[in-house]
Curated annotation (Swiss-Prot):
Any GO BP: carbohydrate metabolic process
Protein name as it appears in the record: Salivary alpha-glucosidase
Purpose of the protein: Functions as a glucosidase that shows high activity toward sucrose, a major component of nectar, as well as maltotriose. Assists the mosquito in its sugar-feeding capabilities.
Cited CDD domains: AmyAc_maltase (cd11328)
Tissue-level expression: Saliva (at protein level). Proximal lateral lobes of the salivary gland (at protein level).
Catalytic activity: Hydrolysis of terminal, non-reducing (1->4)-linked alpha-D-glucose residues with release of alpha-D-glucose
One Pfam assignment: Alpha-amylase
Activity regulation details: Inhibited by Hg(2+), Pb(2+), acarbose and d-gluconic acid delta-lactone.
Keyword Signal set for record: yes
pH profile of the protein: Optimum pH is 5.5. Active from pH 3.0 to 8.0.
Predominant location category: secreted
Subcellular location: Secreted
Amino acid sequence: MKTFAPLLATLLLAGFGSALQWWEHGNFYQVYPRSFKDSDGNGIGDLDGVTEKLQYLKDVGMDGIWLSPIFASPMADFGYDISDFYNIQGEYGDLAAFERLSAKCKELGLRLILDFVPNHTSNQHEYFKKSVQKEDPYTNYYVWHPGVTNEDGTKSPPSNWISVFRGSAWEWNEDRQEYYLHQFLKEQPDLNYRDPALVEEMKNVLKFWLNKGVSGFRIDAVPYLFESVEVENRYVDEPLSRATDDAENPAYLIHNQTMDQPETYDMIYQWRAVLDEFTAKDNQTRIMMTEGYTSIPNVMKFFGEGEQNGAQIPFNFQMISNLRKTSTAADFARYANLWLDNLPAGRRSNWVLGNHDNNRIGSRLGEAKIDLYNIALQTLPDIAVTYYGEEIGMVDQPIPFNETVDPAGLRAGPDDYTLYSRDPARTPMQWNSDKNAGFSSADKTWLPVATNYKQLNVKAQDAAQKSHLKLFKRLTTYRKRQILTHGDLDLRTTDSNLVLYKRKVDKVGYVVVVLNFSDEPQSLAAIKQQFPGADDRLQVVASSKLVTIKDNKWINVADTELPGESAIVLQKLWGPNPVVVYEA
């Protein structure tokens, strides 16, 4: 059993509308621009395409959109190798296209969040080119080392560190006659945050885009920002993990010298201070989201420490990292509770079930459970983050090696690429049953469109009597009401593989959500067994595809079964359950 009282849960009807800032119960949508909508027919999504579809995002209930990287890039890692932080990638448009997008967001009341990639740049960036030549102030913008001289006079890297993308994390540069560090591709040299000039320049990047009206940033690859310092003219080797015999695989080492260094958190706090400067000017809160696949204690440090504030939304990857198709109700509860048990007082929860680096929900957790997980995402406390296409139940599209473009897959080779390639979860958005699913008029798109697009698309689901999309819209509308914005949480499991949780606000009412992780029907009598004070009759708010009971109908819970791998949202109101209006 888990009980959890979110911040401000006791605020009731009088004045509760002023209790929440816009992000505190926000619904955020990750747009992968390359795959969202192509406006000019070249097979690649772009900013004008995103602008064209903003009304759709408003209609599905979003409060903010997070754009994966849109800055100038040679595209060695599809935008995560930035060659100019102050300009837009030409394939996506230009600054004028960005201004159009920003203006339309403001018109629709959508907040715009940009992906900030601070750990590294492209090796084509002017910073790097000038650092190679030792032109100040760029000389120490990157992590350089002359290497270790061997007895025969040859050079070796200054440590055994391994890149995320396999092989040594050190690359020799002939012009500078030194090694540079790259924790990702060799085309992505690591920036040196021990250099004060670099720290100030990256703050200038944030300020540039804040001055253009963005509402915040998602910070990429945060645990990698700092490495340990040199000891006796070399870096400390990382210990062997014993997890694999493959010495090229990053899992070969325990990354205690290249991740989660103490200085990382102070850098996050410094960036938050930049955002707060802008918030103070106009009382419009700017937010920070952080990406960190690291331990729970480390993630929680991103929130802040003492008087220092950090990210409002350190991404909660517990379910992405740990749940699979075979996961049970107990597994779901374990990872929900692990997050909630460690959440610092006064901080907001967030729930992330998909992104561009992981298999889609249907492929990772089971197609039959797509609705179940979307119901959970939209009814758990506080913030929800949705990856594009998950609202219609898009699934991974198998892609042959000769059409693979993801460097992680290509570097693994034709035998193992399917274990590493992220391309299957990045295919074009499926808008309708027209050519290329309505994504593009091009003869060839940058990645193949999923073969199921004729049946699975936005237009078809909008027209269907019951669909993933219609359920998603109903959920995002309902979650703006007071029970889900302010209700406490009481989460339980049963031996029959059910998760049940209750969200309640005194004098307003309560919601009960039931998730059936079994593949067999289960009686909703479990509601009364787990919550003895619950009513015999409850009203259906929403349900997954296999549930035949119509929304708004009243049911006797003791007489009702929930189909396998399905979910249902029920309510009992004692008074008005109004929509909560957010502050700036």
